[in-house]
A protein has these predicted regions:
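A conserved beta-strand element that flanks and buttresses the S-adenosyl-L-methionine
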Residues: 47
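S-adenosyl-L-methionine-dependent methyltransferase catalytic module, highlighting the catalytic core
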Residues: 57-66, 70-72, 76-164
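Adenosine-cofactor binding site in Rossmann-like domains, unifying the SAM/SAH pocket
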Residues: 10-40, 134-135, 139-145, 150
Length: 164
């Protein structure tokens, strides 16, 4: 089974995952999440947590099509991203991290999604059956990443998966 962890940063899910990120950590095998080094229909699962927010809406469409290209017929794309429907109801504490400088070198969120908007861009990119997933019921639930991000007991991640 080929499982990709895109935009993984320092989070190492173990040897059964292929880690892809521009950062320099020992577990990272490839750097470019926009052009994956796989043939068509080779990958079973793609997972990314809080990665797509770094691309604007025009950039993300060809990227999603690339991810779809490498996924097998029954392949799954699993995405966690800041949930705009939740965050827009919150006041100042989350808005800085949402659109502000995130790290050194400076990287910034360029967009946020609600379920309807994310479903639309995924459908336009050829994905089907877009639905929320429970982050505690995945094969990566034991890893601390932003798919399980809570603020004042409210889950702030929009966690969706879809199929080819």
């Amino acid at each position: 089974m080929v499982k990709l962890h895109l935009g993984c940063g320092k989070r190492d899910f173990g040897p059964e995952w292929v880690h892809i990120d521009q950062a320099d950590f020992p577990h990272i095998r490839y750097k470019d999440v926009t052009r994956l080094p796989y043939v068509d229909s080779e990958v079973d699962l793609i997972y990314c947590s809080h990665l797509i927010a770094y691309f604007d809406r025009e950039q993300i469409k060809p990227i999603l099509k690339e991810w779809r290209r490498v996924l097998k017929r029954k392949g799954v794309l699993r995405i966690a991203t800041p949930d705009w429907n939740v965050l827009r109801r919150m006041k100042d504490p989350m808005l800085g991290p949402l659109y502000g400088k995130m790290s050194e070198p400076p990287i910034y969120h360029k967009t946020v999604y609600d379920l309807s908007g994310l479903r639309s861009v995924l459908n336009e990119s050829g994905f089907k059956n877009v639905k929320r997933y429970n982050h505690t019921m995945t094969d990566h639930a034991q890893f601390d990443d932003h798919s399980a991000a809570y603020h004042n007991v409210v889950l702030i991640s929009l966690n969706v998966e879809c199929h080819v």
